[in-house]
């Protein structure tokens, strides 16, 4: 297996798949496929040629997908022939792709220079524990593809302190395990308060500020009070690394999608490439943080109930 991989990687050095792309990851229901379609539409409007690569053997084929793992094998046939459950079958599919990357390389060869959007499976274990998918992404990087991981998380988890701490732990574990330039995204911002009110301003969650306030929120619940020390330790780990922040996104808000693309281009190095060598582009990267903060304020005003007060007035209470 190792010899075959080495031989394949040597061949990749001779015929590199030069290009950029996004590995779109995240738990089920976080909006990965919707994001991929919206991002492809945005890239088309910008005149950037892109292609969808469907690496999820469980879902339906993306309309217009240039490559689909289901052409190699599908989840249903694995479950039927090997008598595995859904989770075991998905892990088997990823391991099978890992061992047959020559198939994927052959399919990608005709897409050299095209911006790739990798729609990945939604099983969290693939990003936090299992080695197959990170190895596949690493090998793609060895072929000359400069990928950025875009990790989508449903924004309504912010309304539940316990769930948000779990999201932070999952995001941190994913960042350390996948080992790619990484952008965390709070998706479906237009539905953020569908299941409850936010305890703090939106920027508290996007910037992952002092988590001791969140732990205190948990202690108000008798069920979580006995787990206070556990939550304090988890919060300490997250703050010690200091890696996790989020960008807000609503597919209905084209400007927020553009900001995510700008952050991805900066992380992957696309904005410094020959296709976009201009002083204006470099300056836009330098001030990107200000635009992101403005975007967060806009989402706060538009989608978060604030009892008639402005964001500035609520900020004074923190």
Swiss-Prot record:
GO terms for molecular function: GTP binding; GTPase activity. InterPro entries: Gpn, Gpn2, P-loop_NTPase. PANTHER family: GPN-LOOP GTPASE 2 (PTHR21231:SF3), XPA-BINDING PROTEIN 1-RELATED (PTHR21231). Belongs to the GPN-loop GTPase family. GO terms for cellular component: cytoplasm. The keyword Lipid metabolism does not apply. This is GPN-loop GTPase 2. GTP binds at residues 29-34, 187-190. Small GTPase required for proper localization of RNA polymerase II and III (RNAPII and RNAPIII). May act at an RNAP assembly step prior to nuclear import. Signal peptide: none annotated. The record marks 87 as: Stabilizes the phosphate intermediate. A motif (Gly-Pro-Asn (GPN)-loop) lies at residues 85-87. It comes from Xenopus laevis (African clawed frog). The keyword GTP-binding applies. Keywords: GTP-binding, Hydrolase, Nucleotide-binding. Heterodimers with gpn1 or gpn3. Binds to RNA polymerase II (RNAPII). It holds the Pfam family ATP_bind_1.
């Amino acid at each position: 297996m190792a010899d075959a991989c080495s031989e394949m990687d040597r061949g990749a050095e001779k015929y590199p798949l030069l290009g950029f792309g996004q590995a779109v990851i995240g738990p089920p229901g976080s909006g990965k496929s919707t994001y991929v379609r919206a991002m492809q539409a945005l890239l088309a409007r910008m005149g950037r040629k892109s292609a969808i690569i469907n690496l999820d053997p469980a879902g339906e084929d993306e309309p217009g997908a240039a490559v689909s793992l289901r052409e190699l094998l599908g989840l249903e046939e694995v479950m039927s022939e090997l008598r595995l459950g859904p989770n075991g079958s998905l892990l088997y599919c990823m391991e099978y792709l890992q061992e047959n990357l020559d198939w994927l390389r052959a399919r990608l060869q005709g897409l050299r220079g095209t911006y790739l959007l990798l729609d990945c499976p939604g099983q969290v274990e693939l990003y936090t524990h299992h080695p197959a998918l990170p190895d596949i992404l690493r090998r793609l990087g060895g072929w000359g593809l400069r990928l950025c991981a875009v990790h989508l998380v449903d924004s309504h988890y912010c309304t539940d302190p316990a769930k948000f701490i779990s999201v932070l732990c999952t995001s941190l574990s994913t960042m350390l395990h996948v080992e790619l330039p990484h952008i965390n995204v709070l998706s479906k911002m237009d539905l953020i308060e569908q299941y409850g009110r936010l305890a703090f301003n939106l920027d508290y969650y996007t910037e992952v500020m002092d988590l001791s306030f969140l732990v205190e929120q948990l202690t108000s619940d008798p069920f979580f009070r006995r787990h206070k020390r556990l939550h304090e330790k988890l919060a300490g780990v997250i703050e010690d690394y200091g890696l996790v922040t989020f960008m807000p996104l609503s597919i209905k808000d084209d400007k927020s999608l553009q900001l995510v693309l700008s952050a991805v281009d900066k992380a992957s190095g696309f904005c410094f490439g020959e296709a976009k060598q201009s002083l204006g582009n470099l300056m836009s990267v330098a001030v990107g943080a200000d635009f992101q903060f403005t975007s967060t304020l806009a989402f706060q005003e538009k989608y978060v109930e604030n009892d008639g007060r402005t964001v500035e007035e609520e900020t004074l209470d923190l």
